[in-house]
Amino acid sequence: ATIRVHDVRIQPRQGLPVVQWFYNDAILDWYRLKPFEEAFWTRVAPYMRNLVEHGQDTIYTPVFTPPLDGVKRPSQLLKIVRTGPDAYAFGWEDVKRYVDLATACGIRNFEWTHLFTQWGVKHAIRIYEGQGEEGRLLWPPETGATSNTYRAFLAQFLPEFKAFLDREGLLERSFFHVSDEPHG
């Protein structure tokens, strides 16, 4: 049998963002890296370029660990410090670095982490102190989606997130999750 291969390329889609989830924790596991250590940034860049080479223009950006993976391996870009009861400070440096690297690799749009758990939006997602390296959650996993604790967090996070998106020119190039499978 003979196989004939033709040199044909389909033009990238225009006006329809393309995204398949991109799991940083898989890269961390494969290369045995700590979340967002210097070696991570070198390893992740070729994967980002490969996404673009295969027609993807949007990347899932784990400002928090994706809720589906919250118990597997924390890999949140946002650094969070508890400054008091229901009070937090946020470090955006790694989020910015990730966005800048993805942009340099050809990514145009950004899909952001869910704000609530899947299967009915019943709970706050698992968000970690620091970047999750020690596995300390900011609240118990059963914390309600509308609890005072999570409302206090969102009241601090969302304005800072919006300011970050505005500052970086990302708001019009962003997609936001509330929850997956909301009716379970």
Give short role names for the model-derived ranges.
Residues 1-184:
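Aromatic-lined carbohydrate-binding surfaces of glycoside hydrolases
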